[in-house]
Amino acid sequence: MHTQALKYLNEERMLNIAMSEAVRRGNAEILSAERGAVLLREKNSGVYMLYARDYAPGEALLNLLLERGDVRELSVTRADLCRKAEELLGLRLDFEYYHVAYLENRPPEPAGRLEIRTPSEELAGVIADHYEHLNEEQVIAHIRRGHLFGGFLGDKLVGFIGEHPEGSIGILEVLPEFRRHGYAYDLESFMIDRHFNQGKIPFAQIFTDNEKSLSLQRKLGMTQAEQSCFWLARR
């Protein structure tokens, strides 16, 4: 079923890059795979991901999720299925986003201005203070899993970047006093290079209204999906 799922997902490659990477990395529990409609659960995060070219097969997959009864986070590829998921599963739209992915044959050249390394756990509080989506305990968990990196000038933390549980590049932040120097490029190019050399396709999820970040992705050579996706969560 994995080969079949990849075949169908790759028919709209950029739209489905998070799903196809979950399959490629061995982190996908595939619940259904048909041409134009694939449903999986990403094992590391527990996030369900639903691709449907048309509404009707997507609605059928939402009903399958209703039967499972354990959905806390869900990504869908259609606005009408987003609305149906809110109604049927009791989820709420968290954000709308574009997938971006690095599809080039070699990674971008690193600027080499920062020393990028795993930060000490003593910096977890500082990182949590500058990134609203993780608390201090969650930051420590990311550090221990090797999924969070800091950029340093000497012993000063300039910014940080990491990997979300479902495998996307994110958690990117440059501390206020170091902004407007291009350090975000340095940090993300490091993560792209890291994933590239691990045999992964580097990808990220960017809010549709975050033009600053979308511009950064273009500078890095990332390809952007034409169609947006929708992330829902239980609140």
Please state what every model-predicted region is.
Residues D80-L91, Y185, T208-E226:
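Conserved active-site alpha-helix within GNAT-family acetyltransferase domains
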Residues M1-T3, L89-S120:
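Conserved N-terminal entry element of GNAT/NAT acetyltransferase domains
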Residues I169, P202-I206:
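Conserved hydrophobic beta-strand within the GNAT/NAT acetyltransferase core sheet
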Residues G90-N105, Q205, G221-R235:
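Conserved catalytic-core motifs of GNAT/GCN5-like acyltransferases
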Residues A56-L65, R180-H195, E211-K219:
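Conserved acetyl-CoA-binding loop-helix of GNAT-fold acetyltransferases
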Residues M1-E73, R78-R83, A128-H133, V139-A141:
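N-terminal charged segments
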Residues E42, E137-E177:
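A conserved beta-strand-loop-helix scaffold within acyl/acetyltransferase catalytic domains
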Residues R35-G36, K156-G159, K212:
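Glycine-rich acetyl-CoA-binding "A-motif" of GNAT/NAT acetyltransferases
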